[in-house]
Swiss-Prot record:
Substrate binds at residues 89-93, 143, 194, 221. Belongs to the queuine tRNA-ribosyltransferase family. Residues 252-258, 276-280 are annotated as: RNA binding. Its EC number is 2.4.2.29. The active site is at residues 89, 271. Pathway: tRNA modification; tRNA-queuosine biosynthesis. It comes from Clostridium botulinum (strain Loch Maree / Type A3). NCBIfam families: Q_tRNA_tgt (TIGR00430), tgt_general (TIGR00449). This is Queuine tRNA-ribosyltransferase. The gene is tgt.
Length: 376
């Protein structure tokens, strides 16, 4: 259940109560594709750096180790030793982005595994069953993420099919949640708004799915090559047509400036691999924007990554030392930078929540954008 606590302009401060705890929103979900953050970050680390929600990938876990294995091990929470909320995506995005050979039909999608090439089928019911086996807190509906740009006629047909799939997802989840051997029989379902960059298609789809009384609503199919202006335009068009008493999730968007702009437009949930991926390549976020620790100017820099930061890396190590670790190809380098970046994001969201609570979010946003100077 979502409770709206405060608004600052259109920015929303809320609480989302789940079977695995209360999520303070706006929130950034830390992405652990295979039930772990790439970069040797443990579930204990995630708690230390303020992670509220972990996100895992249905498609990848279905292939390895297999959702049946996870179910036999008691579900994702027990498997990865994490007692806070977990969101699993539906696998739809990976089916359409990773598989070069796929066939879309009304019942679902036939595609080839990106690992061994074997033929796999996934539809709404299969996605729900896999996510039920994983026993995540929040399951995402199975949808088609169309390429951008895509012909209007195709987008219209795709959105209609995605709506039919959403009804099937809801029916299947209700069935699964009623079974005696279901680990999490209070699993929640978020629907996904699609429609490419066509505002009218997006709006009609938002109105349609808003009637279904789901636990939350996502805006999908963005951050796939469109301009930031197009992204903001679509968010502006869609958000007013989604229920105000449900959380709104902008999928796959994680550039800090994009997060601020989306919060300013009423978005509550975010996720992205960006902070962890950047950290693994020595790109770290600071109050002044993003820097590359491999640059020669940091060789003798005895400052922490970001002065004043309370993450494990900044409390104990210098830019010079971490740069040396990267040059020496030591795994500790990746770990420290991933921890720092995730802490930066989680702390950013805490500052955003405080700014909305204090009704100074607009001023906060403008100050942060000025500090970053287009470097974040």
């Amino acid at each position: 259940m979502y409770k709206l606590l405060k608004k600052s302009g259109k920015a929303r401060r809320g609480e989302f109560t789940t079977p695995h705890g209360v999520i303070q929103t706006p929130v950034f979900m830390n992405v652990g594709t295979l039930a772990a953050i790439k970069g040797a970050v443990s579930s204990m680390d995630l708690k230390e750096i303020g992670c509220q929600v972990e996100l895992s990938n249905t498609y990848h876990l279905h292939l390895r180790p297999g959702d049946e294995v996870v179910k036999k091990m008691g579900g994702l929470h027990k498997f990865m030793n994490w007692d806070r909320p977990i969101l699993t995506d539906s696998g739809g995005f990976q089916v359409f982005s990773l598989s070069k050979i796929r066939k879309i039909q009304e019942e679902g999608v036939y595609f080839n595994s990106h690992i061994d090439g074997r033929k796999i089928f996934m539809g709404p019911e299969e996605s729900m069953r896999i996510q039920s086996n994983l026993a995540s807190t929040i399951a995402m509906a199975f949808d088609e993420c169309v390429e951008n740009p895509a012909p209007r006629e195709y987008v219209e047909k795709s959105v209609e099919r995605t709506t039919r799939w959403l009804h099937r997802c809801k029916d299947e989840m209700n069935r699964l949640n009623s079974l005696p051997d279901t680990i999490n029989n209070k699993q929640m379902l978020f629907g996904i708004n699609q429609g490419g960059t066509y505002e009218d298609i997006r709006i009609e789809h938002a109105k349609t799915i808003a009637k279904m009384d789901l636990d939350g609503y996502a805006i999908g199919g963005l951050a796939v090559g469109e301009s930031h202006e197009d992204m903001y335009r679509i968010i502006d068009a869609v958000v007013p047509h989604l229920p105000e008493d449900k959380p709104i999730y902008l999928m796959g968007v994680g550039i800090p400036s994009n997060i601020l702009e989306a919060v300013d437009r009423g978005v509550d949930f975010f996720d992205c691999v960006l902070p962890a991926r950047n950290g693994r390549h020595a790109h770290v976020f600071t109050k002044e924007g993003k820097i590359n620790l491999l640059n020669a100017k940091f060789e003798l820099d005895d400052r922490p990554i970001d002065e004043g930061c309370q993450c494990p890396a900044c409390k104990h190590y210098t830019r010079s030392y971490i740069r040396h670790l990267f040059k020496a190809k030591e795994m500790l380098a990746m770990r420290l930078c991933v921890l720092h970046n995730l802490y930066f994001y989680n702390n950013l969201m805490e500052e955003i929540r405080d700014a909305i609570d204090g009704d100074y979010f607009k001023e906060y946003k403008e100050r942060k954008l000025k500090e970053w100077g287009g470097r974040a």
